[in-house]
């Protein structure tokens, strides 16, 4: 494929935009470098770049575009609302309608607040949990990404009794001292952390199904034990469902798994492609938030009518019969086809699939925790990524990310993707 115009625009972008991108995940640094492809438009399962190349898109903006690009129903809703006004600074009926649809789908959201991003949503749930428990420390799991606020950009210590260290320049050591990081799916490490820190722990922050070092399921009983241990300690359980809400079924992962948290953060999919975040949970906990309680949270754009209208339209698409069955079926076809090709070409790789989302890891063991992904073959992934890109398959440029299917992908797209993977694997021997 010819990418000359993307390369020209990336050089121009570097003059004005720091690093040439507005999020580091969009650079190709993790796959050997090079100019990122500059996209011009998207329709359904496809993206089109500035050089006129067409791509089958599995990046899907890192997850939000589950109904495909420029879905007619969502696009129409956005256009209609834009003509009426995009921001009022007052309550709107759309906020009420959207909140009701969300609570109907996710019953644990007894009370809801909207914000503008997943980062904001998680950041605020932590503040609310601290206000409710009157404690300061939190526990998070290694490898899970919860946004870029200071408190969650913390790397693991050497063990469950050790405090974390900043995972980014600009995060104070004093902040990192409030965070304990333990391995996902290691209930003994979690018990040890709770036993050691006891009544200092305000909350544990959990991705019920991990989406930030690929797609990783909790081990049987893990989430149930986390809930029990936490509640026995007076610690709140916060689920980060920014990736998982409405990903696998019409609702949240918590309902699919049958394990209910105290608070939930959500975002991505529910905005229909527009900026959004939100959080909610038990009424007695949520009443800590202003204007009813002492924990402050506000936002000029929070609950704006454009995002509310897009979110309502998106849920109207997802609540139709057969949507998630189709995603699961296509995901199964893609997984089975890739596994056959891995065997055919004797590639060291494995796949985690959860319904219509999957991750291809270049490692020889089934992935259940972060260290396995950290030590997987990033060089092999980088080669695979570029071989696929040059055949019109758009993936996330990182070995840690997932492939996302949409309502608009077809069986023909899967077959074309497998044909591209067949060639890519053949060039990696």
From Swiss-Prot:
This is Glutamate-1-semialdehyde 2,1-aminomutase 2. Pathway: Porphyrin-containing compound metabolism; protoporphyrin-IX biosynthesis; 5-aminolevulinate from L-glutamyl-tRNA(Glu): step 2/2. Its main location: cytoplasm. Homodimer. PANTHER family: GLUTAMATE-1-SEMIALDEHYDE 2,1-AMINOMUTASE, GLUTAMATE-1-SEMIALDEHYDE 2,1-AMINOMUTASE 2. Its EC number is 5.4.3.8. The gene is hemL2. One of its GO terms (cellular component) is cytoplasm. The keyword Acyltransferase does not apply. It comes from the Bacteria. The lineage of its organism: Bacteria, Bacillati, Bacillota, Bacilli, Bacillales. It catalyses: (S)-4-amino-5-oxopentanoate = 5-aminolevulinate. PROSITE patterns: AA_TRANSFER_CLASS_3.
């Amino acid at each position: 494929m010819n990418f000359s115009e993307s390369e020209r625009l990336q050089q121009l972008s570097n003059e004005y935009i720091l690093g040439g991108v507005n999020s580091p995940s969009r650079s190709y640094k993790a796959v050997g470098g090079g100019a990122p492809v500059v996209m011009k438009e998207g329709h359904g399962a496809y993206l089109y770049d500035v050089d006129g190349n067409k791509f089958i898109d599995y990046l899907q903006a890192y997850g939000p575009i589950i109904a495909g690009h420029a879905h007619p129903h969502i696009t129409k809703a956005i256009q209609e609302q834009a003509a009426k006004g995009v921001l009022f600074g007052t309550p709107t009926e759309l906020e009420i309608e959207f909140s009701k649809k969300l609570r109907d789908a996710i019953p644990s959201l007894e009370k809801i607040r909207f914000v503008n991003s997943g980062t904001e949503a998680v950041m605020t749930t932590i503040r609310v949990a601290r206000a409710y428990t009157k404690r300061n420390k939190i526990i998070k799991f290694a490898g899970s990404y919860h946004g870029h606020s200071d408190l969650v950009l913390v790397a693991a210590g050497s063990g469950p009794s050790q405090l974390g260290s900043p995972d980014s320049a600009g995060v104070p050591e004093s902040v990192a001292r409030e965070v304990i990081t333990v391995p996902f799916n290691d209930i003994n490490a979690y018990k040890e952390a709770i036993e050691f820190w006891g009544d200092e722990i305000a909350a544990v922050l959990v991705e019920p199904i991990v989406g930030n070092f690929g797609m990783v399921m909790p081990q049987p009983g893990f989430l149930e034990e986390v809930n029990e241990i936490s509640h026995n300690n007076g610690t709140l359980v916060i689920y980060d469902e920014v990736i998982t809400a409405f990903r696998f079924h019409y609702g949240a992962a918590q309902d699919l798994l049958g394990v209910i948290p105290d608070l939930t953060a959500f975002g991505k999919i529910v905005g229909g492609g527009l900026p959004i975040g939100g959080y909610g949970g038990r009424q007695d906990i949520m009443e800590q938030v202003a204007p009813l309680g002492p924990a402050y949270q506000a936002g000029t754009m929070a609950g704006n009518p454009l995002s509310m209208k897009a979110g309502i339209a998106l849920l109207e698409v997802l609540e139709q019969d057969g949507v998630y069955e189709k995603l699961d079926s296509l995901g199964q076809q893609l997984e089975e086809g890739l596994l056959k090709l891995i065997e055919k070409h004797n590639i060291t790789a494995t796949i985690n699939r959860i319904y219509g989302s999957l991750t291809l890891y270049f490692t020889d063991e089934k992935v259940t925790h972060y260290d396995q992904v950290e030590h997987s073959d990033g060089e092999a992934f980088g080669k695979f990524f570029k071989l696929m890109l040059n055949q019109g398959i758009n993936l996330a440029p990182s070995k840690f990310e997932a492939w996302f299917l949409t309502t608009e992908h077809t069986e023909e797209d899967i077959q074309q993707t497998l044909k591209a993977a067949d060639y890519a694997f053949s060039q990696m021997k």
